[in-house]
Amino acid sequence: MASLQDIQRRISSTKKTRQITSAMQMVSTAKLSQIQRYGRGYQAYAARLEAVVEHLVAAHLFDNADAKHIPLIAQRPIRKTGILVVTSDRGLVGSYNANVIKQTNALMARLNLDTTNTAILAVGGNGADFYKKRGFEVILEHRGVSDVPSFNEIRSVVKTVTSLYESEVFDALHVVYNHFVNRLTSEYRDVQLLPLTGDTLVAMGGTEAHKAELDIQSAYEVEPDTTAVLNVVLPQFAQSLVYEAVLDAKTAEHAASSTAMKAATDNAKDLIGRLELQFNRARQAAITTEITEITGGMAALE
């Protein structure tokens, strides 16, 4: 049985741990509130940009013969697939990273991907480290994403991604991440980003029926020409999709961290209660033993 001093030391160390996890929970909760406010502001821009592209799809600009030669739209044989994996840089986020990696591995299995035909682009250290150790080619690694990432911060990543795609380093790109649902729940998402197609809009929440309602080809006169318009709009759309994914994933990360730290704080509280009960019982047993010994000694003197 542990001594009273050992139990006291465990109680003291557990209380210190509880203070740390409680502070980390409050910090994560504050970051979550901050990024949610920021995200709501960005959604206004993203919704307008998506509406513009949605109308271009409905106007059949993507089907234009000239448009098919634009690098971000052009279809080509898929020899190598790029996967942009969004994870966190550190742990203490529950099953957040494990879920992304598990589902990404399942995606690779469905697409028959392995180390020979897959290029990993990692936003976050956990994903980069995991796939490096397993022999995958990590062609892009971006660590140290801000708690509330700015658009400019992610724009450099997207420019690198699109440049690699246009250089035919890979022939298709999937973006995989955890989508924030609420403070307790996130769900895995996989969006095929490149080549950009009308189907990308369906994956992002649009529907074929909705696109049919927008069949407004005759309402558009494109100036100066289709290629010029799409060359401006499509890179912005790609940047927006990736930024939304990173912002969404970062929101889910803060929520996961807050939930994990709350669970750790609650567990520490329960452990302290059990240790204090154990301490009281041990102290009571020690006092009882001491009284018995004193009583026995007095009886022997009589």
Swiss-Prot record:
Keyword Oxidoreductase: no
Subcellular locations according to the entry: Cell membrane
GO MF terms, alphabetically ordered: ATP binding; proton-transporting ATP synthase activity, rotational mechanism
Membrane topology listed for this record: Peripheral membrane protein
One annotated GO biological process: proton motive force-driven plasma membrane ATP synthesis
Pfam families given in the database record: ATP-synt (PF00231)
Any Gene Ontology CC annotation: plasma membrane
Keyword annotations of the record: ATP synthesis, Cell membrane, CF(1), Hydrogen ion transport, Ion transport, Membrane, Transport
Gene3D superfamilies: 3.40.1380.10, ATP synthase, gamma subunit, helix hairpin domain
InterPro entries cross-referenced by the UniProt entry: ATP_synth_F1_ATPase_gsu (IPR035968), ATP_synth_F1_gsu (IPR000131)
Family in the record: Belongs to the ATPase gamma chain family.
SUBUNIT field: F-type ATPases have 2 components, CF(1) - the catalytic core - and CF(0) - the membrane proton channel. CF(1) has five subunits: alpha(3), beta(3), gamma(1), delta(1), epsilon(1). CF(0) has three main subunits: a, b and c.
Function: Produces ATP from ADP in the presence of a proton gradient across the membrane. The gamma chain is believed to be important in regulating ATPase activity and the flow of protons through the CF(0) complex.
Name of the protein in its database record: ATP synthase gamma chain
Organism taxonomic ancestry: Bacteria, Bacillati, Bacillota, Bacilli, Lactobacillales
